[in-house]
Regions:
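Glycoside hydrolase catalytic-domain context in secreted enzymes
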Residues: 1-518, 524-539, 561-982
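Short beta-strand elements
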Residues: 541-561
Length: 982
């Protein structure tokens, strides 16, 4: 999959324009000289014109060389990369895709055992999406077009199930391709045929074909735009935000540039206020049609964004429901195996499926919110997407009550009727068999809790079960906020035969029961009281439980840090709290209406404005804030005889690192830091080789060579396996394929939170829960690292929506939610998997860009968690707020930039900033030298092919110029002699 980023194209033009201007000047001067020589004697005229032509040719050769070895060298390195994936490795990955799919699909309903459908049976498959299903998403998490996909119907056929060809032909004839949802523009059209097009003959044929029907409903999201919350606005065009771009042209802003072709469906697909995650009118009419003709109906929801499914209960004919996010390249093979009963489903939901998403606590605080009084912060530099020119915001007003943590707690407090509000709980899933779970007594040494859970298959077929361990902590009214259900750990059994049992041991650190008290103690606190530790079938239903009692409060402050921390976790994000009311459990969520209301003000306070930082406010005053007045100048250009390879395996704190860094020049440091777009740069002075880094969360794809891997299922589907082993296998497969592609860095896994169901990139992220997300991500990272591949955990942090993501998006949240919800997966990835690479995020945390937030990148990531490695920015576009000066001074090390721009290098070189550059270079070098790039068999890759080609072209050009010059001189002498004879 070869992709072209228009930001890069525009930047290339910008970077080479001076070279082109210089060549243009030479060209004009040469032409003027040629013109001036027109009246001279023939020999002299010809000679002057020949020399002018040769000057043009020489200038062209020089300019081409300067461009290739200068601003274009990085891009040429990227496009000339080598490496490919073997057929054997691709075949292994393909089968793993199928395994993940078949273990992640959730059997949500199975009345009258309608599933499995016996192999050899016939099935009517309704819904246009059955012929154009969702395989993944768009953007960095997209699949590689070089590999064929297995579609849904083929998956059924390969499992021995026949399907109605008349129906599938009807759908493909109606519309053969799925409308595109991209970063610059989104077509949200659902081309579901009008029910009037289903003829009586077609329905009669279907009933004669089979008495069972399957209906497929699909939703697709992608990078760059969230799913619409108002489809009627998309249809009438008011969803599109018009902007004037840098050329003065009007166009739709990327985030809100969605369209809908309602003429396909006779202009009646959505009612006012409908959103994208509910049935369209056409889909509802299709459900009516199918259920009025068939008594045995199976519904398949094919999408990673939790869909409103409350309508299912209104149709007694619907007896089976399957939840199946994007399956990757071949995963519908696994889907067919589940439907046919070849595999017993064991997936569990990774999100809560709410009956009414508009009643969710985040509904009013998700979307497009622009500050109205901050025009002085506007950036005319954001010309690639003019929507980014104005500061925006989002309020995480629900605090820690995200997903099931709200619904379970709100039900316990009497705020909601759980059965009316929740269709499928978090962690929910059925099986073709039945299980029991029995929990042992808890033992504790004061540091950890130990117990076991015995799972027994009490049904008639083999299957796997999931053990989910939750904590219901003691809560004091008005005290530290606590949800009544909190996932602590989980495990998946092996396949158990009927009557077979398996015992799983758990060790839970006592510190995992603590809550973050940002208001009083400013640290984690484990309050005295009874903690109910339970094994559940899902977040709502307890199977067995035990009580663990804490005798007195334990405060994890500076003098009593948590065992897992390098230094105590203390308040770092007071500045991100903002001036909003946060949802509280106090008095039964008495402030629910106030806290969850839409923002009352769109004005930025003077205090926030004074501290708001972008490229144009982070100037010398900002530098001074981040300066160390006592910093000493650095040593450069030393001759210590070290090369980077000599430091493989050397401890990060060893003094040899200082000796190596002393050898680097300022230019070396700038190159190392400034050019991290899909690579780390070569540094000749220390023998550092260039390494390749590749996207993305679902595969490993080189966007410059087009070489890539098999695409894996959406991360949500991986999360729905609830299998740490499969997550590890996924990372292992990515690492193996990356190694064959000569790739050392993987831009994944992504582990942001499904704060809402409408985030466009939910398919890239695992879950609404931090522990489930963290366990899956940590295992994937560990698997990749076994092949020497450094995995970039991303997007760090609070990057939970696409709308306005590069529009200086100020994300306001209290510290408890930041730590317990949004940072949790990253914390687990560092502590449990020893991750060594991070990709930060586009958004702001409060008033500070995440990539320039010292509290996040230095104090928490490196200080508290003990992270050793480097932090790379997200794509370093010209958005008006990303700058190496701020990033490097505050913990970012590498700019995700391929061609260079005005801000990807340090511009103010003080002792303090040079020390920061040196530290950034060390962080990068430490990670790279301990990666596969410095394994013996991968060193000495030789000269890049493009350089060999350039040298060859230079030799040819030199010979040509010499030959032409010789000919010109020879002809001049001949003409001169002829003129003299005359």
């Amino acid at each position: 999959m070869l992709s072209i980023n228009m930001d890069d194209v525009m930047q290339v033009v910008s970077n080479i324009q001076n070279y082109l201007i210089a060549f243009g000047v030479v060209l004009v001067l040469a032409l003027l000289v040629m013109f001036a020589a027109r009246k001279m004697p023939k020999a002299k005229k010809k000679m002057i014109r020949a020399q002018s032509g040769l000057a043009i040719l020489l200038a062209l050769a020089i300019v081409v060389n300067l461009i290739c070895t200068g601003p274009m060298s990085t891009m040429l390195d990227l496009v000339s990369g080598e490496g490919s994936i073997s057929e054997e490795t691709s075949a292994e990955a393909t089968e793993l895709v199928n395994e993940i799919t078949q273990e992640g699909i959730v059997l949500a309903q199975n009345d009258d055992n309608i599933l499995p459908v016996a192999s050899g049976s016939k099935l009517n498959v309704f819904g246009w999406a059955s012929t154009s299903p969702c395989y993944g998403g768009t953007g960095s998490g997209a699949l590689n077009d070089a590999y064929p996909v297995t579609d849904l119907l083929t998956g059924l056929h390969d499992a021995g199930i026949e399907t109605n060809d008349e129906l599938s032909k009807f759908y493909t004839d109606y519309c053969s391709t799925r409308p595109s949802v991209g970063m610059a523009q989104q077509d949200w059209t659902l081309p579901e045929p009008n029910v009037s097009l289903y003829t009586d003959e077609m329905m009669a044929n279907a009933k004669a074909y089979s008495d069972t029907a399957m209906v497929v409903i699909t939703r697709v999201g992608g990078e760059g735009a969230d799913l619409p919350t108002d489809m009627s606005a998309v249809v009438d065009g008011s969803w599109v935000r018009r902007v004037t771009d840098y050329r003065g042209s009007q166009r739709g802003a990327g985030y809100y540039n969605g369209t809908y072709d309602d003429t396909l469906n006779e202009g009646n697909d959505w009612d006012k206020g409908d959103h994208f995650l509910q049935l369209s009118n056409r889909e509802e009419e299709l459900i009516d049609l199918v259920t009025s003709n068939f008594d045995n109906v199976i519904v398949v929801y094919n999408g990673a964004n939790a869909f409103e499914m409350d309508w299912v209960k209104n149709y007694p004919q619907i007896k089976g429901v399957l939840l199946c996010p994007g399956t990757g390249q071949s995963g519908f093979e696994g889907f067919g195996r589940v439907v046919a009963g070849e595999v017993n489903p064991s997936g569990r939901t990774a999100d809560t499926y709410a009956a009414d998403l508009t009643a969710s606590p985040w509904w009013n605080n998700f979307g497009d919110f622009k500050y109205t009084n901050a025009t002085e912060l506007d950036s005319d530099s954001s010309f690639f997407d003019p929507a980014g020119a104005t500061a925006s915001f989002v309020n995480y007003a629900e605090g820690i009550y995200v997903g099931y943590k709200f619904y379970e707690t709100a039900a316990d407090e009497g705020l909601i009727d759980y059965d009316k509000e929740v269709v499928y709980p978090f962690g929910y899933g059925l099986s073709y068999t039945t299980f029991t779970q029995k929990m042992s007594d808890i033992t504790s040494d004061g540091s950890s809790l130990k117990f076991s859970v015995t799972v027994t298959n009490t049904g008639s077929v083999a299957g796997k079960d999931v053990v989910e361990i939750y904590n219901d902590p003691p809560y004091t009214n008005g005290g530290i906020e606590k949800a009544s259900a909190n996932l602590l750990d989980f495990a998946k059994t092996s396949e158990l035969a009927p009557g077979e049992s398996e015992t799983i041991d758990f060790t839970i650190p006592v510190e995992d029961l603590a809550s973050y008290d940002y208001k009083n103690n400013g640290c984690y606190v484990l309050e005295a009281g009874d903690y109910i530790i339970s094994t559940n079938s899902d977040s709502h239903n307890v199977l067995d439980s035990k009580t663990y009692t804490v005798a007195s409060d334990i405060v994890y402050n500076e003098s009593n840090k948590r065992e897992s921390d390098a230094v105590a976790a203390t308040n770092q994000f007071d500045f991100a709290e903002g001036e909003i009311t946060y949802l509280s459990r106090a008095d039964g969520f008495a402030n629910y209406a106030e806290a969850t209301a839409a923002p009352a003000a769109y004005e930025m306070s003077d205090e926030v404005k004074a501290g708001f930082e972008n490229c144009f406010t982070y100037t010398e005053s900002g530098y001074e804030k981040d300066e160390d007045a006592n910093a000493e100048d650095i040593t450069t250009g030393a001759k210590n005889g070290l090369k980077l390879a000599d430091l493989r395996g050397v401890d990060y704190h060893d003094s040899k690192w200082d000796d190596l860094l002393d050898e680097m020049s300022i230019d070396d440091l700038q190159q190392t830091i400034g050019f991290g777009g899909y690579q780390t740069a070569a540094v000749d002075s220390i023998g550092k080789v260039r390494t390749n880094d590749c996207d993305g969360p679902a595969s490993i794809n080189n966007n410059f060579t087009g070489v890539g891997s098999v695409g894996f299922p959406a991360a949500t589907l991986i999360g729905m396996t609830w299998s740490k082993d499969l997550a590890h296998d996924f990372g292992d497969s990515i690492g193996k394929m990356a190694n064959e592609m000569n790739t050392s860095g993987w831009y994944g896994p992504a582990m942001n939170i499904h704060r809402t169901a409408f985030s466009g990139r939910n398919f890239e992220y695992y879950s609404e829960d931090g522990v489930l997300s963290g366990a899956m991500a940590a295992n994937a990272i560990a698997g990749a690292q076994e092949h020497g591949v450094y995995a970039y955990m991303k997007h760090f942090a609070l990057n939970d929506q696409e709308g306005n993501r590069t529009s200086m998006l100020a994300t306001w949240s209290n510290e408890q939610a930041i730590r317990e919800i949004y940072l949790k997966p990253f914390e687990m990835s560092v502590k449990d998997a020893d991750c060594h690479a991070v990709m930060s995020s586009f958004n702001y945390i409060g008033s500070r860009w995440a990539g320039g937030c010292k509290e996040l990148l230095q104090n928490v990531l490196r200080g508290e968690w003990g992270f050793l490695g480097f932090v790379e920015t997200d794509y370093f576009g010209v958005y008006g707020y990303m700058t190496a000066d701020q990033g490097v001074r505050n913990g970012s090390d590498l700019m995700l930039c391929t061609t260079g721009n005005d801000f990807n290098k340090m511009t103010v070189l003080t002792n303090s900033s040079k020390q920061a550059m040196r530290t950034s270079a060390k962080n990068i070098l430490y990670t790279v030298v301990n990666s596969r790039a410095y394994e013996a068999e991968n060193l000495n890759p030789g000269m890049a092919k493009w350089k060999i080609v350039l040298i060859g072209a230079d030799v040819v050009a030199a010979l040509l110029i010499v030959g032409l010059e010789y000919t010109a001189i020879k002809n001049y002498k001949k003409r001169k002699e002829e003129e003299e004879e005359v």
